[in-house]
UniProtKB/Swiss-Prot annotation:
Part of the 50S ribosomal subunit. Pfam families: Ribosomal_L4. GO terms for molecular function: rRNA binding; structural constituent of ribosome. This is Large ribosomal subunit protein uL4. Residues 48-75 are annotated as: Disordered. Keywords: Ribonucleoprotein, Ribosomal protein, RNA-binding, rRNA-binding. NCBIfam families: rplD_bact (TIGR03953). Residues 60-71 have a biased composition (Basic residues). It comes from Staphylococcus carnosus (strain TM300).
């Protein structure tokens, strides 16, 4: 267990929180992180590519010329692959690129990504945002007070409408909850800003 500073939205220290080393201070497994990122990117692919084979191309139902006696090569349809306008051989068809990763590997990838951010000083814990209404100006001020870089992943314990609406128009800022936390978002951000309650929830889920 290690202590992490908990900051207020004005940048001052509010206290500290003790978090498990098994979640936030392990030796990052880069291979597992790489596999998790590949899995997510594969799942994001649409896979709607499609071409027509010889049976799907319109026309070509009639034999272009008789089988024998013309001196030309035998042909059965003008929609065969060797003809202009013919079907495509072994072309791409709609498919899903997603695949599965064992649960233990997924959890290890998340712990590794979080630990990597902690090692790189890209992990900040805040007590709470306490926004009473959606205000982009107020949220921008919070990021400035905490001296965070431009690309920030904000993690809340559950959906916070005020935080989401306040941050959605700020370039480089992404909002997620503990249940939506993933390796691609963590590694893409320069810094992770997480509430104390969310950090405890992550520890509970991944610990």
């Amino acid at each position: 267990m290690a202590n992490y500073d908990v900051l207020k939205v004005d940048g001052s220290k509010a206290g500290s929180v003790e978090l498990s080393d098994s979640v936030f201070a392990i030796e990052p497994n880069k291979d597992v992180i790489f596999e998790a990122i590949n899995l997510q990117r594969a799942s994001l692919r649409q896979g709607t590519h499609s071409v027509k084979n010889r049976s799907a191309v319109r026309g070509g139902g009639r034999k272009p010329w008789r089988q024998k006696g013309t001196g030309r090569a035998r042909q059965g349809t003008i929609r065969a692959p060797q003809w202009r306008g013919g079907g495509i051989v072994f072309g791409p068809t709609p498919r899903s690129y997603s695949y599965k990763m064992p649960k233990k590997m997924r959890r290890l990838a998340l712990r590794s990504a979080l630990s990597f951010k902690v090692q790189e000083n890209g992990f900040t814990v805040v007590d709470a945002f306490g926004l009473e209404a959606p205000k982009t100006k107020e949220f921008t001020k919070v990021l400035s007070n905490l001296e965070l870089p431009k690309k920030v992943l904000v993690v809340t314990e559950s959906e916070d409408v005020n935080v989401e609406l306040s941050a959605r128009n700020i370039p480089g800022v992404q909002i997620t909850t503990v249940t939506g936390l993933n390796v691609l978002d963590i590694t893409s951000a320069d810094s992770v800003l997480i509430t104390e309650a969310a950090a405890k929830k992550v520890e509970e889920v991944l610990g």
